[in-house]
Structure formats: structure tokens, C-alpha cells
Amino acid sequence: MKGGNYTSLGTCSGINVSGNVAGTRKMSLGKSIKMYLTIFILTTCIYMALYQYHISREPFAASEVVKHQEKSSSYIASYLWSPISLLMANSSSNTNNNSTTTSTTTTTAPTTPTTTTTTTVGSVGQKLGASSISSIRMVSLAATIPSFKSTLSESRSVSLGGHQKTATVKTSTTITTRTTASGLATTKLSATTRTTAKTSAKLSAATTPTASHMENGYKTRPTFVAASLPPPLYIITPTYRRPEQLAELTRLGYTLKHVVNLLWLVIEDANKTNPLVGHTLDRIGVPYEYMVAPMPEKYKQTKKAKPRGVSNRNRGLEYLREHATEGVLYFADDDNTYDISIFEQMRYISKVAMWPVGLVTKTGVSSPIIQAGKLVGYYDGWIGGRKYPVDMAGFAVSVKFLKERPNAQMPFKPGYEEDGFLRSLAPLDDAEIELLADECRDILTWHTQTKKNAPAQALNRTRYKNTNLEHIDRLLVRP
């Protein structure tokens, strides 16, 4: 009996000991879990505090072009609930920047935009209408969707430029835009018309965000949209064969090259085109039409002053009536000097505009007289009974205004070419004449004259055979 009791008591004692051990283990496990949770929470808070401190230390980029990025809720949650992501913030950010995010480079230029030029030479047999000409001029605006759409007018080249600040933005996931400094397409008119379009525009846009870009929750807003070109300019330049011809065309051409949306009508007083002139125009790169318009024989034979350049200018007027719809025409002689700002001023006129011209007659200037903002007369060294005693370089006319007067042309009357042409634009009131160049208080064009040079003597081909002089001699213009 005692032995049985002893056994029974031993069994109960063993049970109690086992229960105490199990309870102790549960308490230790609970304390461990609490400790680990506490450490985890403290570690997370420390990581978050360090990350916020790191973000606050990063400087903001002071750029003219700001790419705004929005983070989705899933993107933010990944940082709140994953302490590992806090450690990988810098590395993942660098990786994403290389693959999916937008990298922006801003370049400021005083006069010309950053461009990539693609050259195309050819003839375009279509009419030139400014209303259908379009281009991609970079304008700092904000959009709401990561897409970009633009169209180019069919078979018409375009231009970009202007005196403004521009920014070049390279975006690997949204937009990649390249533009060129280009000109207008020209129209082949007849067998004697030669056309060369020197430059064209190229547009490449990635309009669909990548999959990884969408997964990360980024919403990048493009900052550039398309804008139309300014009204076109039609520059009519009469020329004739002489030793200074190529030099003067080169000087004028490189002036016009700084003007956007321009077509240069070069019209020679000859029966056929000159390959040297065509070569020079090709090299300059300004969009042009090269035509011929010989002076009528009855004026060539006269011993009096000849009406030079009249047939050329009238030929240019015929071209505009046939091909142009709007814009502004301007008679630019190849020996004059021009401030390019006058071209930007004249392109927005509605009818007729005038301004002073320097180096004219004994007065040194030919100009409208302005009093209290109104045209009250003309100042010129030779009035000669003219209603409009102005220089050829001192006025411009709207193409639309010209086409409303189909009989307007320049008379074959030496000294009265400008006056006769402006009279043919009647009805034209003085109040309708716009005053440019700071209301005629500034001089932006000059009637310069190149010194006449004697024709080059013939090359001794026997003495200089197989030398560079044989090639140079072909570039000399002899009457």
C-alpha cells in the first residue's frame, strides 16, 4: 500500500513539473516575439527617419524645364511597408533613371534653337500656302497625358527658329523630339524654273509608356507641344550678270538664312539660268526659286536710263499671284544691307508698311515723316513729283492685299518704279500704311552699293594647265 501511494505521488509530481516547464517555455516564446516585434518596429522607424533625412538633404534642380512626377498609392506603400526598399532607394532610383524615367537637359541659346539637321535636295511641284505650313516649334507648356501628336504638311518643308529661349529634352519613355532649322518648299513653275529645297524636318516621338514605367506608377507629363509657323515671307531679288553677282548673292543669302519661314525668289535679267548662280544658291541653303525674266528689247536699246529690275520684280509678282495665298512680299536688292529684325516686323502687316532707308541721296536717308504717330509726308533727296518718294528697300506689301489688286505691277519708268507700284495698289490711304522700325525712328535697311569691278582677264591656260586656277576660273562671272 505504501509503495502504491509512493508511486501515485511521484506521478503527480512529474505532471506538475512538466506543466511548469511548458508554461515557462510559452512565456519565454511570448517575450521573444514581443522583443523581435519591438526591434522590427524600431528598425523600421529608424530606416524611415534616415530616408526622410536623406530626401531632405537632396537639392532641388533649378531648371527652366520641370518634369513633374506623381507617385501612385502602390508606389508610396512599397516604401512604407518595406524597410528593404528604403535601403535600396538610391540604387533602384539610379536604375530607373537609366531605364524608364525622364532625363532633362536644358540649353538656352540667344538666337537659335538646338537642332539636328537632315538635308534633302529636290523639287516640289506643289503650291506654297502658308495656311497649310506647319512646324514643331518648342514651347514650354504643360500637358496632361504622356503622348505627343504632330503632323507635317504634305511635301512642304518647315522651319524652326526665332529669337527665343529653347530647351532640348530627351525622354526615354515619353517623347524624343528632334527638329531642324529649315525653310519652305518651293514650287517648280516652268522649264526655266529651277527649284531646290535644302532642308526638311524630322520628327520622332515615342507615344506609349513602357511596361515597367506603368508598373512603377509614374505619370510623366510632357512639357512641349506643337506650334504653327509665323506668316511666310517672300523675298524678291532681281539680279544680273556681273563680276560682283555671286559675292552679293552670298552676302544677302546668309542674311536671309537667319530668317524662318522664308522663300527667296531670285530672278535674273537673262534668257537662261546661270549654273554658277544655282550652285551658289545651293551652297547657301536658303529655300529659293531661281527664275529668269529678261528686260524687253525696246528698253535694252534705249540710250536713256534703263528700268533695271522691273521685269524681274513683275515676274516675282506673277509667281506670288499663282502660288502664294498669304504672307508678305518684299523687294530686296542683292547689294543692300539688312538688319534681320526688319523681317520679323514686316511679316505681320495687314496691307502696306514703310520704314526709313539709310544711305539714300544727299540727305543720307529716305523716310516717311511721322508727327504725333501719323504719316504727314516724306523725306527724300529727290521728290520728283512722286506721291510715294520712298526707296525700294523701304516698304513691304501683304500678299493678300496684292492679290485683291490683280492689275498692280511695277512700271518700266526709271526713277518712278516704287511710286508707280504703290500707286497701282490703290485704293490705299495713308492711315492704312503701317509704320515699322519704331515708328520710323530707327534705320534697319541701307542702300549700300558695291564698288564696280572690271571683268577678270582671261586665264593663260597653257601656263597654268593642271593647276587649281583652272577650277577657280570657272567660278568667275564675266559679262
Curated annotation (Swiss-Prot):
Pfam families: Glyco_transf_43. It comes from the Eukaryota. Glycans are attached at N90, N97, N98, N271, N460. GO terms for cellular component: Golgi apparatus; Golgi membrane. Signal peptide: none annotated. Residues 51-479 are lumenal. PANTHER family: GALACTOSYLGALACTOSYLXYLOSYLPROTEIN 3-BETA-GLUCURONOSYLTRANSFERASE BETA-1,3-GLUCURONYLTRANSFERASE, GALACTOSYLGALACTOSYLXYLOSYLPROTEIN 3-BETA-GLUCURONOSYLTRANSFERASE P. Involved in the biosynthesis of L2/HNK-1 carbohydrate epitope on both glycolipids and glycoproteins. Enzyme has a broad specificity. This is Galactosylgalactosylxylosylprotein 3-beta-glucuronosyltransferase P. It comes from Drosophila melanogaster (Fruit fly). The gene is GlcAT-P.
